[in-house]
Amino acid sequence: MRKVAVFGKPGSGKSTLSKTLAKVTGLPLHQLDSLFYQKSGEPVAREIFDKAHEDILISESWIIDGLGPLGAFKKRLDAADTLVYIDLPYPTSYWFVTKRLLKGMFIKPEGWPEGSSVLKGSIQSYKMLRLSPSFWNDEFMAEVEGMAQHKTAFVIRSLSELKAFIEKHAR
C-alpha cells in the first residue's frame, strides 16, 4: 500500500477514511478538492491541476482522496496499487452531505478547501449525487473488479464496513 486512490460519491466518508489512513501509514495525503478548487470555490486552470496531479502520481507514495476530472481519475486508478471504493447507499450519502452542511455553519469540514464556501460546495455535492448513478454504476463496478486482478481493491458498501475498514487499518 504505497499509492492509494480513495474514491466514491460525495458524502461517503472519503476524507475521514483518507485522513486516518495517512495518519497510520505515514503516506502523504492529497485531497483532490484542495488541488482542484481555489479559495473562491472556482476551479483552478486545468493545466495547473493537471501538472499538480501528475507530480503527485509520479511521486513514490501517496493517498489521493476524491474524483476530479475523469481523465485524471482514470490515470490515478492506473497508477494506484490500492483502490478504496466507498459505495455507500444514496440516502446515507445525502445525509452525510446534509450533516456536513449543517455542521459546516459552525466548523469547517475536514479536508474542505481553505476559504471555500461550505454552502456552494454542498450544493455542488447534491448536484453530483443526483448525477452519480450515471457514473457510479454496475459498469464502473465491473471496471474496479477487473483492476482488482492486479491491484489491491476494497469496496465498502455500508457504514459498518466503513467503520471496520478504518478500525482494521488504524492499527
Residue ranges and their predicted role:
Residues 9:
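P-loop (Walker A) phosphate-binding loop of NTP-binding proteins
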Residues 30-82:
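Conserved nucleotide-sensing/catalytic segment adjacent to the nucleotide-binding pocket
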Residues 24, 128-171:
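NTP-dependent small-molecule kinase module
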Residues 12:
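ATP-binding Walker
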Residues 88-136:
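A glycine- and Lys/Arg-enriched "phosphate-lid" helix/loop adjacent to the NTP-binding pocket
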Residues 6:
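Hydrophobic anchor at the beta1->P-loop junction of P-loop NTPases
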Residues 15:
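Walker A/P-loop
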